[in-house]
Amino acid sequence: MVFMGKPQNRNRENIAQVLRRHGIAPTHQRIEIAHALFTRREHLSADQILKWVNSRCAETSKATVYNTLKLFLERKLIRELVVDPTKIVYDPNTEPHHHLYDVVSGRLTDIPADKLRVVGLPPLPQGTVADGVDIIIRTRPQT
């Protein structure tokens, strides 16, 4: 994936080129949403993306943000992480990796895939194969 690896500044023209390569028409709003995701290198919720985009350009609707995130997911530009039943965030890093989730602050931190080893999987339903393993280690301050 083009945006993975070391964080880099991405200008809007580079973002537009990446969107085109993935078969996505680079509208102004899609470019701004991608800019929020790929320049900040954070795990952002749809509401955080909406707020960030609207603070920098003309009003973007919540529906536009959700539809764009869905499109980016389908084209594998981002990953969706459900960190708890009430919180979904979007990850611009599509390379294999895992996460630490601080349940108090809500902060997610990437764990490189080579720092955590999965020894085995349970038996899978007949006719299926594993498509990936996502591990979220939830932490809280010691008391």
Identify the meaning behind each predicted range.
Residues Q48-N54:
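A short acidic, leucine-rich amphipathic alpha-helix
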Residues I31-A36:
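Pre-recognition alpha-helix immediately N-terminal to the DNA-recognition helix
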Residues E74-T143:
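Non-DNA-binding regulatory cores of transcription-related proteins
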Residues V65-F72:
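Basic amphipathic alpha-helical segments that dock to polyanions
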Residues I24, F38-R41, S55-R56:
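Short helix-capping/hinge SLiMs at alpha-helix to coil transitions
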Residues N11-G23:
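Short, Lys/Arg-enriched N-terminal segment that forms or immediately precedes the first helix
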Residues M1-R10:
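Short, intrinsically disordered or compositionally biased N-terminal tails of bacterial proteins
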